[in-house]
Amino acid sequence: MAGILSKPNYNQFLESLIKLLAQTSGKDKIAKILQYGAKLLGYIFLKRSKHWVDVMKKLETTSGSARKVWRLGNTLAEQQKILALFKVKNPFAFLNILALIRQSGMYFYWVFDHLILGTNIGLCKFDTVKLGWYSSVSWFFGLLCSIIIDLNTLAIMLKKEKSLRLTITQNKINANNNNIDTHTITSEVENKAIIDQFNEVIKKKNEIYLNCAKNGSDLIIASTLLKIYPFSQGTIGISGIISALIGAYQMWPK
């Protein structure tokens, strides 16, 4: 316990947290935790304390508004990704079309989000209810395509993992059965390359699992906003927290 709470570890954690918060996307993740944490607590306090329900609602609204400011400019990043998709070898392949729908969905999600912010502060006059619905539709399809693409990539990674695992096992058996010969050094180099490739596949697979969990959690929120399925406020709060924590973990300075 003493080692876990030691000063060097605390300083390292604090340094990583500062680096995370130095990024606008890092601030967005922290604000998202506050936003959906407040939604969850508001649900818990619903039958206990009206005062704390009001406090949590204000925290949720304030955090959500702050996130809209920090997400300004995200359209530019999505625009670059969309343009890059037209430069690939076969831009109209099925997965590339899905990727185009995904990036277009996220692009318009940010556009509508910016317009809502502009309306809220008085720069423009739009129907924020309609903009919110359009934003949710764009977000929903962007997330859905992301999950489909990730599941396809996951299937490929699982096949590679199985193949490489069999190769590594077979190489170990061969090494135990054979005497040391002139090919030992070459075999060791080849085995190391295979093991490195295997480790990369495992890393990629775990990253996909995290992406699916994150996007799946966000999809629950988008589905509720579109009234596809009426998840409870508590479920929405938990989903938002899970998504934000995974996003923060993926951004955490290594």
From Swiss-Prot:
It is a multi-pass membrane protein. It is found in: Peroxisome membrane. The keyword Transmembrane applies. The chain crosses the membrane at residues 92-112, 228-248. Residues 113-227 are lumenal. GO terms for biological process: peroxisome fission; peroxisome organization; signal transduction. Residues 1-91, 249-254 are cytoplasmic. One of its GO terms (cellular component) is peroxisomal membrane. Keywords: Membrane, Peroxisome, Peroxisome biogenesis, Transmembrane, Transmembrane helix. It comes from the Eukaryota. Its main location: membrane. InterPro entries: PEX11 (IPR008733). PANTHER family: PEROXISOMAL BIOGENESIS FACTOR 11, PEROXISOMAL MEMBRANE PROTEIN 11 HOMOLOG. Involved in peroxisomal proliferation. Could participate in peroxisomal elongation or fission. May be involved in parceling of peroxisomes into regular quanta. Belongs to the peroxin-11 family. This is Peroxisomal membrane protein 11 homolog. It comes from Dictyostelium discoideum.
